[in-house]
Amino acid sequence: MKNNKVLVVVGPTAVGKTALGIDLAIKMNGEIISGDSQQVYQGLDIGTAKVTKAEQALAVHHLIDVRKWTENFSVHDFVMEANRLIEEIIERGNVPIIVGGTGLYIQSLIEGYHLGGQENHQAMMELRETLLALTDEELFEKVLKLNPNFPELNRRRAIRFLELQTFGSTDENSGSDYNFLLIGLNAERKVLYERINQRVEQMMSEGLLSEARSLFEKAPDAQAAKGIGYKEFFPYFSGEISLEDAVELVKRNSRRYAKRQLTWFRNRMEVEFEDVFSETYPDSVFEKVTQFLN
């Protein structure tokens, strides 16, 4: 029987997913598939914390630099491409390793969502936030109106059911054919937020402002321009705010995004988180992965 095992590394921005993914790829004969919605764009290297050329030389990476700034990349595109790549990687006898923090991408792949190519990412996020804010009673009331015989009333299944009613197929056989091991990375909030702030300062020293200005001048309305680390500078380029304020916006929005990422993975997916500052990390991860693959 053909191996169908896939590793998935998730967690908030700046927690260390890239480093772990590369370590796993080296140790487990793996190839990395990026699960980041911004790293698909060519030339947006600094603000997306894209893997460097040196890092890419250590392990094979996929779905990096596959779109121009003016091109869109949807959840549907990701699921189609990721499934194709997983199949090819397994055929080569290697281990597919999904690494990224875009929760909607990861969940859609794992649960086999059939979202149309024209799906609206923003609408999906807004619906998710609305459903998460409901009480159990309110949530289950919505579900039972649509399906009085809904088999199991738990929040995760109820939310998924309502999203599928709105955005995709509810075919019970639409799940993925692969066996996924989810590895979640996290750190104490204060420490994580400090790492985020430091990363933004490092990005500034590496030329983030120039990268953002180029995007502002050439493709300000593109999907690529909506990412954190770019859009915050547009008011500065227009003379509306100071550079200092723009940098603080990047830091604030990055911290808020990290919080949303954690909320998504905790509420939507079966993830066991590893503290990246634990004495047993990363050996604890390698042990889990070895057991899973064997």
UniProtKB/Swiss-Prot annotation:
EC number: 2.5.1.75
Obligatory cofactor(s): Mg(2+)
Enzyme class: transferase
Leader peptide range in chain numbering: none
UniProt: substrate binding residues: T13, A14, V15, G16, K17, T18
Alphabetical keyword list: ATP-binding, Magnesium, Nucleotide-binding, Transferase, tRNA processing
Catalytic activity: adenosine(37) in tRNA + dimethylallyl diphosphate = N(6)-dimethylallyladenosine(37) in tRNA + diphosphate
Binding-site residues, ATP: G11, P12, T13, A14, V15, G16, K17, T18
Site (Interaction with substrate tRNA): T102
Family annotation (InterPro entries): Dimethylallyltransferase, IPT, P-loop_NTPase
GO function terms (MF aspect): ATP binding; tRNA dimethylallyltransferase activity
Interaction with substrate tRNA: annotated span: 36-39
One protein family per Pfam: IPPT
UniProt xrefs under SUPFAM superfamilies: P-loop containing nucleoside triphosphate hydrolases (SSF52540)
Record-level GO BP terms: tRNA modification
Role this protein plays: Catalyzes the transfer of a dimethylallyl group onto the adenine at position 37 in tRNAs that read codons beginning with uridine, leading to the formation of N6-(dimethylallyl)adenosine (i(6)A).
Record family assignment: Belongs to the IPP transferase family.
Name of the molecule in the record: tRNA dimethylallyltransferase
Naturally occurring in which organism (per UniProt): Lactococcus lactis subsp. cremoris (strain MG1363)
Taxon lineage: Bacteria, Bacillati, Bacillota, Bacilli, Lactobacillales
Gene, per the UniProt record: miaA
